């Protein structure tokens, strides 16, 4: 366990931003923290990183825990080069390893624009530098507050391939908030938040299984309903909670009786809408 909270609550006057939130972050996990705008995501990160005090509740940290944060808005200087920005930040730490910083530069792929001013970089390049800055002190836990917002799909994939590599090679634990739900599809632990309340939690697969089961719709030639199916219109029937192998098995066994079929694999987006009644935009 790296961080655990119990009854975490934050009020701004009469407004309740967080309401009795219980969170546990275990080492090596990808933790996805999802919610619409104003749900309380950034408030939670600010509290967990010590930038904001909770109104009530307790937070337990692992001994000697090191934390890195990639904020929505960069904290680096647009007028300094990438190299100067990183080395200036590195010197703020008591124990600064030049070897580790050079390794980071290679690992994250920012060597080509080290001598460019930070303010002249593309969105994806800036984000990579922001991640490097957050990893200078070799943190155990990296908080990412909507790290790919505003980036195109290709750049988002580059950033996520990088983060997965860091998690695998460095044993990094990641706490993620995001507007792109596909980035949370493989989360080890997920929390879905709305109006400061946690509505659902579990692994991504558990959340999908409970709130967004896959559906197979079939049209049978003889209009005979398959076992455990639900009857729809136009001689169609629906079967829930089948995984891919079960779908293939069913279609193979009944291929002579099936006129048409449609398979919808449940997603985090489906689960999110089911839980909150809203789309994440």
Which residue ranges define each predicted feature?
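Conserved ABC ATPase "signature" region
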Residues: 87, 96-113
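Conserved catalytic motifs of ABC-family nucleotide-binding domains
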Residues: 138
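Short, charged/small-residue-rich alpha-helical element at the C-terminal edge
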Residues: 213-281
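Catalytic Walker B motif of ABC-type/P-loop ATPase nucleotide-binding domains
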Residues: 142-145
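Conserved ABC ATPase signature
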Residues: 117-121
